Amino acid sequence: MKHLTQNKTVIDWIEEKIALVSPDEVMWIDGSEEQLDALRTKACETGEMTKLNEDLLPGCLLHRTKPNDVARVENRTFICAESADQAGPTNNWMDPAEAYKMLYDIARDSYKGRTMYIIPYSMGPVGSPFSKIGVELTDSIYVVLNMAIMTRVGKKVMDTLGDSNDWVRGLHCSCDIDPEKRYICQFPQDNTIISVNSAYGGNVLLGKKCFALRIASYQGWKEGWQAEHMLILGLENPKGEVKYICAAFPSACGKTNLAMLIPPEGYRNKGYKIWCVGDDISWIRKGPDGRLYAINPENGFFGVAPGTNEKSNPNALAATRKNTIFTNVALNLDNNTVWWEGLDKNPPENAIDWQGRPWNGKTSEEKGAHPNSRFTAPAVNCPCISSEFENPAGVPISAIVFGGRRAKLAPLVYQSRSWNHGVFVGSIMASETTAAAAGAVGVVRRDPMAMLPFCGYNMADYWQHWIDIGAGLDEDKAPKIFNVNWFRKDDDGNFLWPGFGDNMRVLEWIIKRCEGKVDADETAIGFVPKAEDINLEGIEDEVSEDQLKEILSVDNSLWEDEAKGIEEFYAKFGDRLPKALSDELNTLKANLEK
């Protein structure tokens, strides 16, 4: 067999895995359009994919996974570090030797009658100093075609790797899609990922969460950079100056919507624009000028389809109009297009649902699309994609924003007093599960820096790494750190802030703070805007001045309860908890007593 590379470490590993899984055929993915086209045709012939309407959705395909294989599985995801302590209390741990044995037993001969596809891919622009290379072996054309959208694939990647051994090994085996034998295992010390018995996106597109967050966060810890679950956006002012923001939110907090925000009309008329560099993952390093720079290591968007529409996110919708793969959405048989809940108010009557069954959207009680159905769309399709998207040096970060969903606790926005205080703010990030009763507070789920399911090593060490990164930055060069909460409610359970495009008003205040152009009020938790500094032009009818004051208010008694919750959470980490964070918690408590 002719390999696409002379790299001995790559060839040896592939030969070893061929012997393990016994494929009938082996195919290197060279990245050429001809080869990808042939694979699309083959997938449609075998029924693995369905070709959609060429006039309305050119180059688009539909795929359905098995009904028992529709989401990431956190309880089947393991960090196989040398000790349980290295994985930490927030991760599932498995002994590496035991894990390899178990996984190899499951994988053995699982490619019989199948083709092995070898996908060389780059996370980040090929050749960028930020970028890292991986090789994924898979028996799924669906995986190949998704990876060709989500990453940079092909021969140029292997040429860039040369003889280096700095690459991430990834083995994916669909096996029988048996949920009892489904495992997604990361081996940080070995730069290795093994995924078995799944064919769903996040579990099998190994460049995404497995590599770009779990493995890369560990690499960043060892190499002095950061892999973060953050969007990157550029805010352009009327003078044409662009400032960049990284932002981390737990799921269901509107990350993709914020990354592709369309400013309110008043802002657009003045010449404000938002540019999307990335909607999910940031790799961050210190640049030659002492500032932090970020790249989006991905090459596409793997977005949740339900709820995406012309109003909530027109840019994301536009990105899906060509060369996109849809997973587990409904198929409209009348015009061979796709539909999902929240797309419009007009569900098709003659359709096939996500499970492949006839479906009438007007009469059915069941959903046509799975709630976690997805689109995989090329980044270049997005109308607001940043001109810096391919910049190998990344973009300079002015602000880091954390956020969550809190009905009463956090104000609309506040700024940390310092870098370490900002790390504290990120470490206590949480969302309340939405409660049915109006105004009732849901269960608080801590999700530090939105990395709870994605941190590849002990979370306490991860926080210390944040503190160390900050210690290496000059204060005037370090990004300012903020927390936002679009989800504050009144006593009747109504949202107090309109959200969506109007979040631009908060981003504007954040940038003004970074530029030293506005003052703020100091509270027990940090700096909160003066009400007059949040621009309400055009939404005066929706947000009264009293309402704005309510959204910006800090209730110390609620924060006293919160401090107890933080203390309980921190206790999980024992003496590994960075002293800087326990100091910040003590400062918060002291401030609340004043």
Regions found by a protein language model. Name each.
Residues 2-253, 263-594:
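Conserved internal helical-beta-strand scaffold that buttresses enzyme catalytic cores
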Residues 258:
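Hydrophobic positions on the alpha1 helix immediately C-terminal to the Walker A/P-loop
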